[in-house]
Amino acid sequence: MSLQNDIITALGVKSSIDPAQEIRVSVDFLKNYLNAHPFITSLVLGISGGQDSTLTGKLCQTAITELRNETGTSRYQFIAVRLPYGVQADEADCQDAIAFIQPDRVLTVNIKPAIESSEATLRAIGVELSDFVKGNEKARERMKAQYSIAGMNAGLVVGTDHAAEAVTGFFTKYGDGGTDINPIFRLNKRQGKALLRELGCPSHLYTKAPTADLEEDRPSLPDEVALGVTYEKIDDYLEGKPIDANDAATIENWYRKTEHKRRPPITVFDDFWQ
């Protein structure tokens, strides 16, 4: 079996999907998990205004609304968390995402003071953060805030990790990669777009260039520039289609380099790194 086939199997990607059916799979997955764990009553998710959090947020709110209707109680809630670093460049998109999702609650946590405090504390002991490492600090601070909110609301922190992100390891370890539950994990980027179209999402929220926007030296850096390969090629690869050898090599190199991100902490029993 080729590495491409190994990756497709590991990430559970289908070569084609029925968007309505995949919406139902994700919603039922969230509902079933909460039904199996009655002490959990909320879902918590950071909303950025991009494709992945918009889709995941809509799935979360749908699941919570159905649970309330099915149980006849108001104990379940979806909490959307705004997590800007100061002023968000695409604030209008974030507001549009919130309007589309219609979350039960919206909380806003400005992470800038916490990041600046951490940066100053480290500088005082001679550790000067690079712009890249500071970007990872932002991702981890966002996750820290979400876990605090979830902890006070009997909640799960929901992730937005999907197959096109997982294959490249394009997430921050213990930042946006550190979540409790990932309802869109098996989907690639174009499949996520298909689900949003099915859900009636405003198209500008999933047609704009994806960006993590963590680096101040390179603001709004497109994911595809950082990765050196387009999502179209990544999606083709994940659907089992033949792609240019250089693009395939780029994807597979990212996959190998970031294997540690997709695993629990390494122990003496692990040998994948050898």
Swiss-Prot record:
Signal peptide: none annotated. Its EC number is 6.3.1.5. Keywords: ATP-binding, Ligase, Magnesium, Metal-binding, NAD, Nucleotide-binding. ATP binds at G46, I47, S48, G49, G50, Q51, D52, S53, T160, K189, T211. Deamido-NAD(+) binds at R140, K173, D180, H260, K261. It is an enzyme of class 6 (ligase). The keyword rRNA-binding does not apply. It catalyses: deamido-NAD(+) + NH4(+) + ATP = AMP + diphosphate + NAD(+) + H(+). Pfam families: NAD_synthase. One of its GO terms (cellular component) is cytoplasm. Mg(2+) binds at D52, E165. Pathway: Cofactor biosynthesis; NAD(+) biosynthesis; NAD(+) from deamido-NAD(+) (ammonia route): step 1/1. GO terms for biological process: NAD biosynthetic process. One of its GO terms (molecular function) is metal ion binding. Catalyzes the ATP-dependent amidation of deamido-NAD to form NAD. Uses ammonia as a nitrogen source. PANTHER family: NH 3 /GLUTAMINE-DEPENDENT NAD + SYNTHETASE (PTHR23090), NH(3)-DEPENDENT NAD(+) SYNTHETASE (PTHR23090:SF7). Homodimer. Belongs to the NAD synthetase family. This is NH(3)-dependent NAD(+) synthetase. The lineage of its organism: Bacteria, Pseudomonadati, Pseudomonadota, Gammaproteobacteria, Enterobacterales.
